Amino acid sequence: MSGTDKVRVNVSQTAQTPLHTSAKLPKVGVLLVNLGTPDGTSYGPMRRYLAEFLSDRRVIEWSRLIWYPILYGIVLNTRPRRSGRLYDRIWNHENNESPLRTYTRAQGEKLAKALSDQPNVVVDWAMRYGQPSIESITDRLLQQGCERIVIFPLYPQYSATTTATVNDKFFEALMKKRFMPAIRTVPSYEAEPVYIDALARSVEKHLATLSFKPEVILTSYHGIPKSYSDKGDPYRQQCLETTRLLRERLGLGEDEMRATFQSRFGPEEWLQPYTDETVKELAKNGVKLVAVLNPGFVADCLETVDEIGNEAAEEFLENGGENFSHIPCLNDSEEGMKVIETLVRRELLGWV
């Protein structure tokens, strides 16, 4: 056999050998990230959590010369105790953690099970503020051999204050690494059919358990300062789009489902209408039956369970309302997990 023939045989054999077998596929990490949680409800853990959260320039855009004296001189000396008392009302005392951590862990575990048909996929979860941190979980994914990572900021509607800061922190963690994996980030999904359908099903299921039919359903989103929206943050428009699509899916009129914004902080004007003022106004105007859901939260937390389920309910009932119900977030429900799995599988295309 000539040298040329030998080359031909070798090339032919190589062409028939796949570049990767299933055992040799590079590992792909999937990192779910939510906002964050304190480690406890006492002063120390609350102060550490609030300091990290309120020091984020994406969250508070004021000059540090103005903001830091307020933050460290006033806010962090007064707010930790108040916030701790609020967290204590919703705390998962059995696991000694906030509901957000409980649900996010469950979402990660259920997603890993759903993706078990992809043996090279590693699923994990983290928090933007608090523990487990994005940096620590990114380290863990890299240590497990992940050469590609899909990061999923768990926010259906994009805002620089949420989605962008998750991506910031993730890439900040990678800045310290010699090896940087290939990255994909899941975009906002405010109009995704699977998401709208999941919201609609959750509303329908919850309403079927009530002894009353709400006259008005509010879709309450976490607010942001109006100035952020004026500068180009698309958050408000995406929230309104979600509500419009959900309203159409449920066959409701504009007066039957309205978008509002909650959780304002500080002296600035935030996106309006405000949820707390709206429930009070509805009650004073003779509306007796109200339900509220939080489409922008993928898991129940302080802002949904307490701020809506307790505080908004009290406002409504104290001003003449008769029945108020908070519709739970999608959490780790079958509908909620279908949304997460669908979007993750889309981003995994070509990688698994």
From Swiss-Prot:
Iron listed as a keyword: yes
Pfam families (UniProt xref): Ferrochelatase
Catalytic activity: heme b + 2 H(+) = protoporphyrin IX + Fe(2+)
Organism of derivation: Brucella abortus (strain 2308)
Protein name from the UniProt record: Ferrochelatase
Family matches, as HAMAP family: Ferrochelatase
A GO term for molecular function: metal ion binding
Gene name in the database record: hemH
Main location as per UniProt: cytoplasm
Pathway stated in the Swiss-Prot or TrEMBL entry: Porphyrin-containing compound metabolism; protoheme biosynthesis; protoheme from protoporphyrin-IX: step 1/1
Matching PANTHER family: FERROCHELATASE, FERROCHELATASE, MITOCHONDRIAL
Gene3D superfamilies xrefs: 3.40.50.1400
UniProt keyword annotation of Ion transport present: no
